[in-house]
């Protein structure tokens, strides 16, 4: 925001890597910084304080397993450190791919930054107890990258959960 003078929402639009409009120098700089300094994503600043807090929290509130969901992929980095520190099993749930995401090639990455993304992705895939993918293609892709089991849980719903649904009475109903 300090570089652009824009609000958060405006800044996000301006540095959208897949926006095909010609980018200004500031936009290109923001995209370069985002891709090369904030690896794997801008939430990387959460990793250290989250791990510190959660280590203490888990001592007082034990759990059976750690589950991380990304993106943002930084959540997997938090979970990886917690799993290593606690010895707990870890489920890494990927809602989208990481380095094979369609916009990844638009991040203006230096060679070393691209390699760091790939190394972090590989560490997450290898160190998780199990990986969850959202689509068969992502599942197949991850299975070629790691020996860790990769399970498939697609987005959607189970029709059996809705077999008792009452038919609408002709009015538009909104429920929450």
Q: Where do the model's predicted regions map?
A:
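A conserved catalytic-core segment of Leloir-type glycosyltransferases
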Residues: 1-48
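Short N-terminal targeting/anchoring amphipathic segment
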Residues: 50, 54-75, 87-91
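Membrane-proximal helix-turn-helix segments that form the acceptor-binding/catalytic region
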Residues: 74-77, 81-85, 98-99, 111-130
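A short, active-site helix/loop in glycosyltransferases that binds the activated sugar's phosphate group
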Residues: 123-150, 159
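Carbohydrate-associated surface elements
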Residues: 137, 156, 168
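Short beta-strand->alpha-helix junction loop in the catalytic core
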Residues: 154-163
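Conserved donor-binding/catalytic core segment of Leloir-type glycosyltransferases
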Residues: 168-176
């Amino acid at each position: 925001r300090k570089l652009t003078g824009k609000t958060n929402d405006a800044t996000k639009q301006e540095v959208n890597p897949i926006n095909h409009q010609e980018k200004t120098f500031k936009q290109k700089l923001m995209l370069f910084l985002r891709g090369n300094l904030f690896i794997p994503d801008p939430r990387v600043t959460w990793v250290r304080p989250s791990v510190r807090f959660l280590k203490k929290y888990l001592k007082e509130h034990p759990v059976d397993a750690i589950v991380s969901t990304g993106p943002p992929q930084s959540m997997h980095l938090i979970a990886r450190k917690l799993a290593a520190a606690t010895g707990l099993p870890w489920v890494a749930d990927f809602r989208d791919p990481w380095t094979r995401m369609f916009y990844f090639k638009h991040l203006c990455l230096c060679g070393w930054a691209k390699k760091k993304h790939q190394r972090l992705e590989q560490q997450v895939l290898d160190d998780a107890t199990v990986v969850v993918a959202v689509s068969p293609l992502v599942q197949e892709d991850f299975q070629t990258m790691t020996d860790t089991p990769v399970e498939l849980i697609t987005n959607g719903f189970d029709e059996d959960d809705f077999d008792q649904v009452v038919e609408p009475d002709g009015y538009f109903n909104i429920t929450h």
